[in-house]
């Protein structure tokens, strides 16, 4: 199930179109896509299966934050489930002696894991809703610049509605890929 829906967007904005339209769903989808592009992964919990190569370090960089490790194989040999540790999108293996295992360059690793969040953090959901509401408000207009003139003072105020201003608030969940 999508973490941002047409119904949730309508409730967030307080707008309930009289005619049946799919535009709110389009805005919700576009906002979810923008969030995924910014984070570099879809924040909803899902299963991943990846093949990676060791690089001489003690951690493997995965494409999404790890929720649980389902299986790991090294050079085709299944590994015991114990000892695997993760922080954000980094996976490590702690040996019985307490040391972290080094994954030599050229070692082939296959990792199956659950990545993302269930539920999606509220700040990510709110950011997606803010973007979707912005798309809805700006329909047929220019979302880059809106201005207001004050007749008495001759002052003009410009508001810049770049997506980045909203997306910056979810930076703590952003990951950078290999």
Where are these regions (language model features)?
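Divalent metal-cofactor coordination and adjacent catalytic microenvironments
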Residues: 1-178
């Amino acid at each position: 199930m999508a973490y941002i829906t047409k119904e949730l967007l309508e409730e967030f904005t307080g707008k309930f179109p009289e005619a049946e339209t799919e535009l709110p769903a389009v805005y919700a989808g576009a906002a979810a896509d923008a969030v995924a592009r910014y984070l570099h992964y879809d924040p909803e919990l899902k299963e991943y299966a990846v093949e990676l190569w060791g690089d001489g370090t003690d951690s493997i960089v995965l494409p999404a934050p790890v929720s649980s490790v389902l299986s790991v194989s090294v050079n085709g040999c299944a590994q015991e489930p114990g000892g695997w540790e993760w922080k954000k999108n980094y996976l490590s293996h702690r040996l019985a002696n307490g040391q972290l295992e080094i994954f030599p360059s050229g070692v082939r690793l296959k990792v199956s894991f659950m990545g993302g969040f269930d539920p999606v953090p509220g700040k990510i959901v709110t950011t997606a809703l803010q973007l979707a509401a912005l798309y809805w408000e700006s329909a047929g207009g220019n979302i880059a610049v809106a201005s207001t003139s004050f007749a008495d003072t001759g002052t003009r105020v410009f508001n810049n509605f770049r997506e980045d201003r909203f997306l910056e608030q979810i930076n703590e969940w952003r990951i950078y890929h290999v």
